[in-house]
């Protein structure tokens, strides 16, 4: 007999779902959008249908009991009337209709569903949500939601009802992000896209009536396309947090967690949002730290941590070397490093002399080389390369932060690639700060194309180092 656990909404739930096959949900070849409107062109279901039809390599069918035509395509009166079975059903109807539709999906041999609709446990409809979960579990039918945005897999599927022109989406990459909140997921996806961090998968699980974080963690741990697994978590059912931490500890990939509900006010907000039990945050946070699971304190940390760990998986001690053309930026970086438990070893006179000997004549007499290394605004590509070579060889350092201000007149757009190759040759992790403006794009891409994460802020760069230090050994 399987154990049960009791969430804050008072419903009994099995502590573990069976081993779901998520392939049809995340890489469907055929999709049905149930609940399209023949009256409102911008109805959420219509947006989803049209976007999938125009942008993704799947066959998509529109379903509405009234039939008709939508965007020049036939509208079918029911899931059972489609010309062939579908892998994924996207359900966007009023809550009271979802149970019957779910039954029809099961009878029609649909592979799984994402239930976009709200109006369940988050507004007190506990009974209806439990009926959905019981029916699906009885038939081995996986669904995401309800009360969610659903699934985004670059190049495969996008069930978000947000038009493509209103939201920047990440390109394909190594990071998977699972979020209880659709809004948080959208916000983070935009930030990831802006920083050039690619996604393998984004999932909004909403009320997580059936498929939960633990199920997706197990799937993503085995997914060859995913290198880093991140979660935004509002709460767990009783006992579920313990199981999640144990699974995350055993996961062979970096796991990053951003948890809300840290305060009593936050716990109330969580309960009204997705009907989750926030639990004791201090206990959960301590468990993450004990087992080497990276915790992000805020959204900036989540993005920074994912960016760093998608490039560097092995943990470090946190001994940082800093190279920059501006003493002020170096001082700011040192302060931030100190606040986050990172050390900045100082170079002795002998070490400084060796570095100085390799600098250009215009920089030799004015550079400060104690760590941070301040090459001044007169530095050339060669000066940065020489300094990076010395730091990359140093056994006293295990990571380098480059703070680049591209207005320095003597540096070129090739510097990012050249510095990346120096550090790669010595197997030394490199993190870069470059302001994210279009005129610096070639410089930034020189880093990114060579597997070096780039932050648009000094704090973000330091947080990337913090993530590598806090990661559990692979």
Question: Residue spans of the language-model regions?
Answer:
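Catalytic-core regions of core metabolic enzymes
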Residues: 3-474
